[in-house]
Design a protein with these regions (language model features):
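ALDH superfamily catalytic-core signature
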Residues: 1-121, 184
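Conserved C-terminal structural/oligomerization subdomain of aldehyde/semialdehyde dehydrogenase
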Residues: 6-7, 12, 61, 88, ...
Length: 225
């Protein structure tokens, strides 16, 4: 799992960031390890970000993935649906506010409505652990160092994101994140860049020179010294 953190500074492009966050709902219904499921938003743009996410969710049509217009398909099994729903319920029990979703769609299949939980804190189970479903949690920060602290407060570190109005600032934040990959003002990975995680998100790298080395054999020849 990744439990990806997405940091938003006060001068970021909110629409661009929300477009990236919404991929959690639509891209494999959140069943992807690089999903930006933990939103860490500057307090000055918190309300606008939550409102924009709510408005965006209204376009996330749930249904058969083979049908035109469907943006959110089912999760893989009934067991996994129940697991994701338990994460949502734990967030509610811990005091999170359900902005959208939180309920099971009235249709056959293993569907979960795109869910947005606001008012979250880093001690909540739904914030700390990987639900692996269409669930986004939002926390606020009061500055870059606080945002970095919240982002790094995780057992995982696969893919993180920074949306900022200043490129130098974005790079400075990225270099302090305990994450194997960081994307700046985008959610798209670079296919030539090494891919892998820190902490419980794994060891080793795929892609790039590092990925090729993983498929190579290393021979050591020893001689008397």
């Amino acid at each position: 799992g990744g439990k990806g953190a997405l940091i938003m500074t006060e001068d970021c492009d909110i629409q661009a960031a929300v477009g990236g966050i919404a991929s959690v709902w639509g891209f494999h219904s959140g069943q992807i390890c690089t999903a930006p499921t933990r939103v860490i938003c500057h307090k000055s743009i918190y309300e606008e970000t939550v409102a924009t996410l709510k408005a965006t969710s209204e376009f996330m049509t749930v249904g058969d993935a083979r049908e035109e217009g469907t943006l959110v398909g089912p999760v893989i099994t009934e067991t996994h649906r129940d697991r994701v729903e338990s994460f949502i319920q734990s967030g509610i029990d811990d005091g999170a506010e359900v902005i959208v979703g939180g309920e099971r769609p009235d249709r056959d299949g293993y569907f979960i409505a795109p869910t947005l939980l606001a008012g979250c804190n880093p001690d909540m189970h739904v914030v700390k652990e990987e639900a692996f479903g269409p669930v986004v949690v939002v926390m606020s920060h009061d500055g870059d160092e606080h945002a970095i602290e919240l982002a790094n407060d995780s057992h995982y570190g696969l893919f993180s994101y920074v949306y900022a109005g200043n490129t130098t600032r974005a790079y400075d934040i990225a270099q302090k994140l305990e994450s194997g990959n960081v994307a700046l003002n985008t959610i798209a990975p670079h296919m030539y860049a090494p891919f892998g995680g820190f902490k419980m998100s794994g060891v080793g790298r795929d892609r790039g020179r590092w990925g090729l080395e993983a498929y190579s054999e290393v021979q050591a020849i020893n001689w008397p010294s």
